[in-house]
Curated annotation (Swiss-Prot):
Name of this protein: Cyclic pyranopterin monophosphate synthase
GO molecular function, one term: cyclic pyranopterin monophosphate synthase activity
Family from the record: Belongs to the MoaC family.
Organism placement in taxonomy: Bacteria, Pseudomonadati, Pseudomonadota, Gammaproteobacteria, Enterobacterales
EC number from the UniProt entry: 4.6.1.17
Catalyses which reaction(s): (8S)-3',8-cyclo-7,8-dihydroguanosine 5'-triphosphate = cyclic pyranopterin phosphate + diphosphate
CDD domains found in the cross-reference section: MoaC_PE
Record keywords: Lyase, Molybdenum cofactor biosynthesis
Function: Catalyzes the conversion of (8S)-3',8-cyclo-7,8-dihydroguanosine 5'-triphosphate to cyclic pyranopterin monophosphate (cPMP).
Keyword Nucleotide-binding set for record: no
Biological process, per Gene Ontology: Mo-molybdopterin cofactor biosynthetic process
């Protein structure tokens, strides 16, 4: 079984020392979904929401969240991200929005948490902007789709 890297020999939480690790190109992709009523989704698609462009706001929120992940997740390292991409796709056939994020850097630690945080905060932003018209929207699942680079190797979800 793989050891938990954020727990020291005494069983205490600590930030992992990455100073001896090699810098490599690292990338991670994540996704999140927001399920809603067809009328709520139509309002987003048509751009008729009274608060403005829901997708543009969620995209910016996701990008900002990726950049601030280290402030939200206690043991994450502050990272110099070279790329943050947030794509939003209305899926009327499922009455939902799909969010896919991609984060990249050249560094000593991975960007999985940044990609997951970007997807999560973009989903929360959609909820926040639309809660006045629908409070029972469902967020989820949120998951890591892929990661590459680093000592632990590559990972990709089987779709």
């Amino acid at each position: 079984m793989t050891q938990l890297t954020h727990i020291n020999a005494a069983g205490e939480a600590h930030m992992v020392d990455v100073s001896a690790k090699a810098e490599t190109v690292r990338e991670a992709r994540a996704e999140a979904f927001v399920e809603m009523l067809p009328t709520t989704l139509a309002m987003i698609i048509e751009g008729s929401h009274h608060k403005g462009d829901v997708f543009a706001t969620a995209r910016i929120a996701g990008i900002q969240a990726a950049k601030r992940t280290w402030e939200l997740i206690p043991l994450c390292h502050p990272l110099m991200l070279s790329k943050v991409e947030v794509q939003l796709e209305a899926q009327p056939e499922h009455s939902r929005v799909r969010i896919e994020t991609c984060c990249r850097l050249t560094g000593k630690t991975g960007v999985e948490m940044e990609a997951l945080t970007a997807a999560s905060v973009a989903a929360l932003t959609i909820y926040d902007m639309c809660k006045a018209v629908q409070k029972d929207m469902v967020i989820g699942p949120v998951r890591l789709l892929a990661k590459s680079g680093g000592k632990s190797g590559d990972f990709k979800v089987e779709l």
